[in-house]
Amino acid sequence: MIVCWRTVHVPKVERDRFRAWIEENRRLREEHGILFELVLGRSARQNPAKTLQPSDPESGEEGDLVVVTAWASHDAFDSWIETPDRDRLTDSDVHRSVGYCPITRYDVVGGYLNLDGISAVAEFPKEEP
């Protein structure tokens, strides 16, 4: 399994549409082998003082999100990149409104997922007005 990490710059006014676009295209991505896709936004709550601190946050007006996806293999991901279905998805106003950094691939070399625990606490915060 591989995990792909990509920073994306989504203007604040486009964030709801971007998240909806991800969800609307979920089925198609799953048909092409995606295992999961998460969109991460920097939390206002950061580390306690006794731990290493993150750098200053980005502007409150616009900022970066991180998109994390998982695929069964490099071949599965490469097949997705080459499919005309992906080309159709990226030919949209929502996709063009976002700034994309390069994708970095990571091989999964260890760890675990507690799926029952994730299901029990899953909540997705709404964007503040």
Q: Across the structure, where does each feature detected by a protein language model lie?
A:
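Hydrophobic beta-strand positions in extracellular immunoglobulin-like domains
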Residues: 8-9, 71
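Short, surface-exposed ligand-recognition loops at beta-strand->loop->(often short) alpha-helix junctions
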Residues: 9-19
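Feature marks short, surface-exposed loop/turn motifs that line or immediately flank catalytic pockets
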Residues: 12, 43, 74-75
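Short acidic, gly/pro-rich beta-turn/loop elements at beta-sheet edges
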Residues: 16-18, 77-79, 113
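An amphipathic, aromatic/His-enriched active-site/gating alpha helix that lines ligand/cofactor pockets
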Residues: 24-38, 54-64, 68-108
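Carbohydrate-binding/catalytic loop surfaces
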Residues: 43-55
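Acidic/histidine-enriched, glycine/proline-rich intrinsically disordered or flexible terminal extensions
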Residues: 105-129
